[in-house]
Amino acid sequence: MEEKKFDPYQFIGFILIAVILTWMLYRNGPADEAAPAQVTTEQGSTTTSSPEVVQVSDSILQQQKVAAFGDLGSLFVPKQIENVRIATDNFNVEVQSKGGQIALFQLDEFENYEDAPIRLIDESNADFNITMTTLDGRIMNTREMYFSPYLTDTGDAYHLVMKASLSSGEYIAFEYHFPKKGYLHQVAIKTEGMQRLLNSGTPPQLDWKTTVFRNSISIDYENRYTEFTFGYEEDRVDYLSLSGEDQETREGIRWISYRQHFFSAILIPEAPISSATLTSVNLASDEALEEKFTKSFETVYPLTFTSGNLNTKLTFYYGPTDYKTLQNLEGDLETSIPMGWGIFGWINKFIFLPLFEFLSSFLSYGIAIIVMTLIVRLAMSPVTYKSYVSQIKMKVLRPDIEVINNKYKDDAVKRQQETMSLYSRAGANPMSGCIPALIQLPVFYALFSFFPVAFVLRDKSFLWADDLSSYDSILELGFNIPFYGDHVSLFPILASIAIFFYTQMTTGQQAMPQQPGMPNMKIIMYLMPLMMLFFFNNYASGLSLYYFVSNLLTILLMLVIKNVIIDDNKIHAKIEENKKKPKKSGGFSARLQKAMEEAEKQKKAGRK
């Protein structure tokens, strides 16, 4: 269950789908320590960088640090800087001696829009810090301490201990466990003998901060799906605002995800976090197309001393935001991916995702989208048939409706009563097209949610589209058009053309006379292709490909139904025969007519 907040982009998308629905309704109605070493294995290489000796007088530094931190001052004196680099099957990681934290985390098997390896941590864009208070009230941060590395190759993993020790034996350590396969790694935060120096009454504060790199050619599109999400017990998921700055304090958190659209950094604590301050800041703007970062995320929460020492274990996931990959891990991490809420999410998880995975296992990704579209349209063909029959009936009744509108143009209630009477005598129900339209709505919105987060489409090309997860630009404009962009994408143009012709077919087939006082729905429907063109120009080309093929197939289905399956003359004759039959009382029309009469009486009584 997700706890949703206002999302402007999903709101715009839902408005578009609502317009489509309106149109349809309208026309249908600790480890052993080893000395620093260089290790080479089949999985990769682990190296310790050459020491960088800090050319500062040790005695002067010692005096300065002791003055600042008392007995703990030696932890802040740089002797030499030793960074340890480890390569596994799935990532390269570098841990630096200053702060004992990760300075580089790189996914070599994936590339960004500049064909460079995906970096989740680099160039000081991340910080992992523990703030502690001494007995005499001094504040110290691990990011300022200097740690010595102790590396062990255990066969299936690398175990790295980064330790900052006092001469008397007390120490603070980060113990890293990097498996040689997969995207998980563990960190244990430990202290030993520090209870005589640290104030155990003031809980240490863990501060995890990341400034997210831009990885996609469209920073605006990527930023829509770059989000701070977090999970509770019982699969409940919540998130911070996508825009501006948002800071909240939450309790009982099971995991925290810094989702960078197609890549995520996820923190999984050993036990639910009692209380955490969560912050998200949007750094990108539509005009700043060359920005390096998209958002900044930060989490701060207290740790707990055990017998005066720290012994906290954390698990991190740094890898692709892929539904199947996350689903195979513990903790329901796949719920961090916005597959859609309610029935839309169920459709994606249990229908479209398995179907697309099956099709793409033996077809190219573009062809898989086309075949999936064909399957969806064939499944919806009974709905299309029902809609078309409703159109034919409304077309037959159009002249009679015009006569009623002209005859009772000054009496809305009487006009509506006569219209409903006509429907009843003709055996036509103006609401018969509503159910087919409502059935299709979950499919529309589910696919609208599915394609933008489908990791399998990333970097997959089809025809002129280099990446089905991004827009398919065929022309760079060199300037920015508001709400459109600085480029021209072809699939949205094709989809808009298909929607235009589909609109021509349906409105031409069954455009009912405009009711007085009502907006001209024909004009509104002709705006839909233009809206599609602008809205989808920066969207995933895979989604535009789906809508293009879907509308083409719908047009073909309607032509087949019209020219092969349905006999218009029989439908005409049936309606004319029904119109001649005696009027029946009761039913929906009678109840509606009675309700309208009562409303008119109350209205007149109110005027008196």
Question: Model-predicted segments: where are they?
Answer:
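Short linear motifs in intrinsically disordered/low-complexity regions
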Residues: 8, 33, 59, 72, ...
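Helix-loop-helix
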Residues: 1-49, 95, 180, 189-193, ...
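Soluble non-transmembrane domains of integral membrane proteins
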Residues: 78, 83-335
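Juxtamembrane extramembrane loops of integral membrane proteins
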Residues: 28-114, 120, 162, 582, ...
